[in-house]
Curated annotation (Swiss-Prot):
GO terms for molecular function: tryptophan dimethylallyltransferase activity. The gene is dmaW. Its EC number is 2.5.1.34. InterPro entries: Aro_prenylTrfase (IPR033964), Aro_prenylTrfase_DMATS (IPR017795), DMATS-type_fun (IPR012148), Trp_dimethylallylTrfase (IPR017796). It catalyses: L-tryptophan + dimethylallyl diphosphate = 4-(3-methylbut-2-enyl)-L-tryptophan + diphosphate. It comes from Claviceps purpurea (strain 20.1). This is Tryptophan dimethylallyltransferase 1. Tryptophan dimethylallyltransferase; part of the gene cluster that mediates the biosynthesis of fungal ergot alkaloid. DmaW catalyzes the first step of ergot alkaloid biosynthesis by condensing dimethylallyl diphosphate (DMAP) and tryptophan to form 4-dimethylallyl-L-tryptophan. The second step is catalyzed by the methyltransferase easF that methylates 4-dimethylallyl-L-tryptophan in the presence of S-adenosyl-L-methionine, resulting in the formation of 4-dimethylallyl-L-abrine. The keyword Ligase does not apply. L-tryptophan binds at I80, L81, E89, Y190, R249.
Amino acid sequence: MSTAKDPGNGVYEILSLIFDFPSNEQRLWWHSTAPMFAAMLDNAGYNIHDQYRHLGIFKKHIIPFLGVYPTKDKERWLSILTRCGLPLELSLNCTDSVVRYTYEPINEVTGTEKDPFNTLAIMASVQKLAQIQAGIDLEWFSYFKDELTLDESESATLQSNELVKEQIKTQNKLALDLKESQFALKVYFYPHLKSIATGKSTHDLIFDSVFKLSQKHDSIQPAFQVLCDYVSRRNHSAESDQHIALHARLLSCDLIDPAKSRVKIYLLEKTVSLSVMEDLWTLGGQRVDASTMDGLDMLRELWSLLKVPTGHLEYPKGYLELGEIPNEQLPSMANYTLHHNNPMPEPQVYFTVFGMNDAEISNALTIFFQRHGFDDMAKKYRVFLQDSYPYHDFESLNYLHAYISFSYRRNKPYLSVYLHTFETGRWPVVADSPISFDAYRRCDLSTK
């Protein structure tokens, strides 16, 4: 009998006894992901009532939009959210103890003739969430969706002419930041398919859409102009000194009152090095205030601790097979937040640690937490991760961490981890199962 600790401290187990599921697919999604979700809420210090609320929302309003449960022998919609196409990812702001999850809404018509490129499911999902959370505003959602995703005519044209050859077809996803008993909703847009339909680059679609928005909301114009100038200089210099140009990959915004919402532009950085990350952080030397430089010192410290390999990298064009152990390194990324009435865009940089040893990453983060006074997280983080995958050989894993993001504001670091969220806790896997990462576990969930 295994003595592995149960993630969730009882909340997951109790809800599993209570919940009924309308399909086996939803039951599998719950038992695969809820153990880690429950453990993360508990370790981040959410009170017991909020843990039940957020897990209840997850079961009722999110799991129905995750599609078929992934197995190697079953066709499914592949999401850009993870390297093996899973449509869900948990993340944790370790320095602020905020739990978050991101998902690509999927429904029964996703990938069919009615919705070949998954344009529609997000609308139904947003409407469900707007019914249970006050303050959700869809003005900027509607604007960017029109600007950056396919309309019905474009979708039909791409489908009928077989113009989409790529395996990656995600256009949008949602994220919930869990704040005590409430959540803040964000949306992300990937305009790659819109680029195919219109002939405009993904980069131009994103920057043009923000430019038009800034004409109406001029309070974001100063920060946007600074970002435009920086990207233009970087891309111009790419011709002379062989640096790789920056290109916008995706965009996000908060689904709240536009007067308070933030726009984030995500730039793909194909050169992975400390000097390039320093350039991204300071906007080529434009941000040199005391707070920026304090953050830069911590960024350098993280770089030294994590030991990310350097190089010039391309983002893969396809997905890893489910259960495939990665043997790859991803390019880097940074996002820039455009705040109202702030003349300078705020950077957040990403350490792409996918494919690196998870035990070593956990140890590096623990040292960082210890050095900067996050003692509780230093004690809990590695234990939480091991307990979420109790039957794996933790020392040999290299796919639990996808990214580590870092920003610095109000004189403190904001560090988040983005984690593989699949078959967590006591997930039942047998030797001839077509799923999982070859971990053998024994737990009968057939009655739950």
